[in-house]
From Swiss-Prot:
Low complexity biased stretches: 484-494
Region span, Disordered: 1-20, 92-113, 224-322, 330-349, 483-506
Pathway the protein contributes to: Antifungal biosynthesis
Compositionally biased residues, Polar residues: 96-106, 311-322
Organism this protein belongs to: Aspergillus rugulosus (Emericella rugulosa)
Role according to the record: Part of the gene cluster that mediates the biosynthesis of echinocandin B, a fungal lipidated cyclic hexapeptide that acts as an antifungal agent. Linoleoyl-AMP, produced by the fatty-acyl-AMP ligase ecdI, is transferred to the initiation carrier domain (T0) of ecdA. The linoleoyl-S-phosphopantetheinyl-T0 is sequentially extended with L-ornithine, L-threonine, L-proline, L-homotyrosine, L-threonine, and 4R-methyl-L-proline to form the linear hexapeptide. Thereafter, the terminal condensation (C7) performs macrocyclization of the NRPS product and the cyclic scaffold is released from ecdA.
Known uses: Due to their effectiveness as antifungal agents, echinocandin derivatives can be used for the treatment of human invasive candidiasis.
Protein's name in the database: Echinocandin B biosynthetic cluster protein J
Length: 668
């Protein structure tokens, strides 16, 4: 905010934290109009600091409550100023100063201590104002008589500017820096409503509770600047020299640096007091244009104010009802990391690119399941890949050992033994994961068979929905020449057979099948009488249910690609495919993946799975006492798998037995 200086040189400067004290208000050497103008200047800035102090020191939970509290205090202050008692004999309305002239002389009304006390607040005592004594007034009049013609001309022009600016003030309002003299906030003029606008404070640019300390910001620059305020400058006398002094003001409320332009006083003239933080007094010679820095700062403040107004007036985009409901139902997930693309150079041209696969799965699953789409993309290329054959080679090598040791035998704790033990454990992990898939599928097949038996038993017990007109018993009686009375005998016999039938099962087929599995696996365990009681039977039952749930997705893979598809899915590796993640996927998601895999890689996956066949399981599990066949991929070194391409005949040929592979190569 820019305020004009008076003709006379103000009293000496005082620290800003001691504003509005007895020394600052002792303006006896000034005339009445300039004294009132400077008083209003200090009161406005003091009120602004106190408002920021209220917001900063408020103990409310959030900023909205603190802003509401400050708004209530401000409206109460405006109401007290607008009352007729305070307006009578109060401080005259200081104008928005400009360079236009007016013939109306200013009204020099003495400042009222009650009004100053009201603006200052009731929480602190206000020191009595020091008004000029009659002797000081006579001294001031004598000094005026000794003024030079240039000073008199400047003083007349100053009075005209003040008078005309007062006329330009909107009716019922004070200056642009003071609150309007109206209680109803909706009836305020546009220029005065900015003072009651607390949205700028909530934007975090002017003030922010909790992050105020240590943040450097210019409070005045962040407030909207009116066009009249941007021109509040007066021209000094021609012989006046102007110097610029930079003053750093420290305040407990606003941690910022303010620049104050103070004219160089003549010898023997008291220096003006430094106004509060955020006030800038500038004087320049007449007809001198604004400096580039001042003009750029003014344009920057105007652009910032326009941006705030545009932001507040722009409505937020409204979502449709379907989009809003879908956004509420979707679970927000963190942005997943991008998958490794080191293997993309081995993808042939006939396969879709990773970006296309990811976009397809994202389209089917939704953007809220981006991590699952990335997992399915990696799994799409991992099945039957060279990396899968490399892991299978290590697992087969481990399974062929008669007594595989977890840790290699070594008397010394050297580095080579440690690395060899870790490689051994990785191979055991791959072997255990592959065998676990096979045995989980077998467990699910047992449960499915028991469930089908119970479904068949239920269907056999239920009577047919429609009785035949001629049942088998009646047809036999007719053939044998029996009469109609025999039908009653047949009906009575059928009723007796129905009575001999067992009552219907009370449980579902799946639950009954699960109970049969528990009975066969743990015949000595009995369920607890009280429901929800923790016992060994309930723990075993929970573990069995979890295993059946994990086997659900592997069973779908086995049904889609019969043979050895379960052995062609790598564990971790460079594709970062987690087995737990695949087991926890929903059924519909797995079905979407299998359909897409059938469409683009179905021929190759089915061929390599059938080529390995069931012989690979007998090698891994060592279920056959006979000599297990040796496969061609067992003879490939670890570095050789890096040169293989996806979905090629070479990968299929490595899946056959080694003897047949040698015969094919010799014939070729």
């Amino acid at each position: 905010m820019h305020f004009a200086e008076s003709v006379q040189t103000p009293p000496p400067s005082r620290p800003s934290d001691q504003s509005l004290n007895q020394h600052v208000l002792d303006l006896g050497s000034w005339d009445q109009g300039c004294r009132d103008l400077m008083l209003v200047n200090w009161l406005c800035v003091d009120f602004r600091q106190r408002l920021l102090n209220v917001l900063y020191t408020s103990c409310q939970k959030n900023f909205n409550e603190a802003r509401s509290l400050a708004r209530e205090r401000l409206l109460d202050l405006v109401q007290r100023i607008a009352s007729s008692d305070n307006l009578h004999g109060a401080l005259y309305t200081p104008p928005s100063l400009d360079s236009r002239s007016s013939a109306t002389p200013p009204q020099n009304l003495p400042p009222t201590p009650d009004l100053v006390q009201c603006i200052r607040g009731c929480d602190e005592p206000f020191p009595p104002l020091s008004l000029p004594t009659p002797a000081q007034i006579d001294t001031q009049e004598n000094e005026r008589l000794m003024c030079t013609p240039e000073d008199i001309t400047y003083h007349d022009r100053d009075s005209q500017v003040v008078a005309q600016a007062r006329r330009r003030s909107p009716p019922g309002t004070g200056p642009a820096v003071l609150p309007p003299i109206a209680f109803d906030n909706h009836e305020l003029p546009p220029g005065c409503s900015d003072f009651l606008n607390f949205d700028l404070l909530s934007d975090g640019e002017v003030f922010s509770i909790g992050t105020h300390a240590g943040v450097t910001s210019d409070v005045c620059d962040s407030m909207p600047l009116d066009h009249d305020l941007s021109e509040m400058e007066l021209d000094p006398p021609p012989d006046a020299t102007t110097t610029t002094t930079t003053t750093t003001v420290s305040s407990p409320n606003v941690h910022s640096t303010h620049h104050l332009a103070i004219p160089n006083p003549e010898p023997g003239t008291p220096t003006p007091p430094s106004p509060l933080a955020g006030t800038s007094l500038t004087r320049k010679p007449p007809g001198t244009p604004d400096s580039p820095s001042a003009a750029s700062q003014r344009r920057q403040r105007q652009r910032r104010a326009a941006a705030h107004a545009t932001y507040r007036s722009t409505p937020s985009p409204c979502q449709s009802a379907d989009t809003h409901i879908g956004a509420e139902n979707e679970v927000a997930e963190p942005a997943p990391p991008s998958p490794s693309t080191r293997w993309t150079h081995s993808i042939p041209t006939h396969l879709p690119s990773p970006d296309t696969v990811l976009a397809t799965f994202t389209h089917h699953l939704g953007r809220g399941k981006q991590s699952i789409a990335l997992l399915l993309t990696r799994l799409f290329y991992a099945i039957g890949s060279p990396d899968a054959l490399s892991q299978l080679r290590d697992a087969v090598k481990l399974s062929r050992e008669q007594t595989p040791a977890i840790i290699p035998v070594s008397s010394t704790n050297d580095l080579a033994t440690t690395v060899k033990a870790l490689d051994h454990l990785d191979s055991m992990t791959t072997l255990s994961h592959i065998l676990r898939r096979y045995y989980l599928v077998r467990l699910l097949e047992h449960r499915t068979r028991f469930e089908q038996d119970h479904v068949t038993a239920k269907q056999a017990w239920r009577p047919p929905k429609r009785m035949l007109k001629y049942d088998c018993a009646r047809v036999e009686l007719i053939k044998n020449g029996g009469n109609c009375s025999s039908s009653s005998c047949s009906s009575s016999a059928s009723k007796k057979n129905e009575e001999k039938r067992e009552p219907p099962l009370k449980y579902r087929s799946k639950s009954q099948a699960l109970a049969d599995l528990m009975q066969m696996l743990y015949p000595d365990l009995k369920p607890a009488v009280a429901e929800g009681k923790d016992c060994v039977y309930s723990r075993k039952l929970t573990k069995l249910r979890n295993r059946l749930s994990c086997a659900r997705n592997w069973y779908r893979f086995e049904q889609a690609f019969p043979g050895a598809i379960l052995a062609l899915i790598p564990c971790a590796g460079r594709f970062s495919v987690s087995i737990d993640q695949i087991e926890k996927l929903p059924s519909d998601t797995v079905q979407i993946f299998l359909d897409y895999l059938q469409e683009h890689r179905g021929v190759f996956s089915r061929c390599v799975s059938q080529t390995l066949g069931t012989g690979i399981f007998s090698v891994l599990a060592r279920t056959s006492a006979d000599a297990a066949p040796t496969f061609a991929f067992e003879k490939v070194e670890e570095e050789g798998f890096g040169d293989l391409l996806y979905d090629t005949d070479e990968l299929v040929s490595l899946s056959i037995e080694y003897d047949r592979y040698c015969d094919l190569n010799s014939n070729a």
